[in-house]
């Protein structure tokens, strides 16, 4: 005999999302909550991937910022519901199954969800676009100044990097620097797309700067 409890956790990230709790085995089948990107490459559980955990945790952050971040309030509510039950295993629909240290992924999700309203990490995310390298040269001068202050930086060329790889840095870092030229009297199209995605994913409350050149 097995007993399943269904914990309604709407908008993590679908309206009908539920966590299914198997009482006898203390397993949380958490659906999209606590999931991650990343090919499992022959492993299934966290204890089988110890050497690869930094990769999977990085991919979990990328998954969070792309799939769940816009619903961070709901994520915190889901964590609170799950905490009411003892669990030995977290088994999400995507990514590693956490059986050795299930609280590891729960604590990471808690931290990332709280970034929606609480202070984030020191550092600057730099998004740049360039056509004739004029904006890029100006950006390089800015980067030297920021680096001289010991501030962590991540730099993304919006013309060559998919926005899904920009979002983790945008979500976790306190500062954003945007550098791009104009394009026919408007913002560089690739930058428009990157910023639209950031807005959709609820990236906000940042210290931001902007500069560019015109054509």
What label would you give each PLM region?
Residues 3-92, 97-100:
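Metallo-beta-lactamase
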Residues 4, 27, 124-126, 208:
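Conserved hydrophobic helix-helix packing surfaces used for dimerization/oligomerization
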Residues 10, 107, 156-161:
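Short gly/ser/thr-rich secondary-structure transition/capping motifs
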Residues 30, 93, 127-129, 156, ...:
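Short hydrophobic segments within beta-strands
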Residues 89-123:
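Terminal amphipathic helices with adjacent charged low-complexity linkers/tails
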Residues 135:
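Glycine-rich phosphate/diphosphate-binding loop of Rossmann-like nucleotide-binding domains
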Residues 139-154:
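Short helix-loop-beta junction
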Residues 161-215:
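Helix-loop-strand module that forms the ligand-binding subsite of alpha/beta enzymes
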């Amino acid at each position: 005999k097995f007993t399943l409890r269904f914990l309604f956790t709407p908008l993590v990230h679908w309206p009908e999302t539920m966590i299914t709790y198997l009482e006898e085995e203390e397993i949380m089948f958490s659906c999209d909550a606590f999931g991650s990107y990343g090919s499992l490459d022959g492993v299934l559980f966290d204890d089988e991937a110890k050497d690869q955990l930094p990769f999977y945790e990085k991919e979990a952050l990328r998954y969070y910022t792309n799939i769940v971040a816009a619903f961070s309030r709901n994520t915190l509510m889901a964590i609170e519901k799950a905490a009411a039950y003892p669990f030995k295993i977290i088994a999400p629909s995507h990514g590693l199954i956490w059986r050795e240290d299930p609280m590891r992924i729960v604590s990471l999700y808690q931290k990332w969800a709280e970034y929606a309203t609480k202070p984030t990490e020191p550092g600057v995310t730099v998004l740049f676009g360039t056509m004739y390298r004029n904006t890029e040269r100006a950006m390089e001068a800015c980067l030297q100044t920021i680096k001289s202050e010991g501030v962590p930086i991540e730099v993304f060329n919006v013309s060559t990097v998919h926005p899904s790889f920009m979002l983790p840095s945008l979500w976790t870092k306190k500062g954003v620097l945007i550098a791009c030229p104009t394009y026919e009297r408007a913002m560089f199209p690739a930058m428009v797309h990157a910023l639209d995605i950031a807005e959709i994913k609820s990236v906000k409350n940042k210290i931001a700067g902007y500069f560019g050149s015109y054509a």
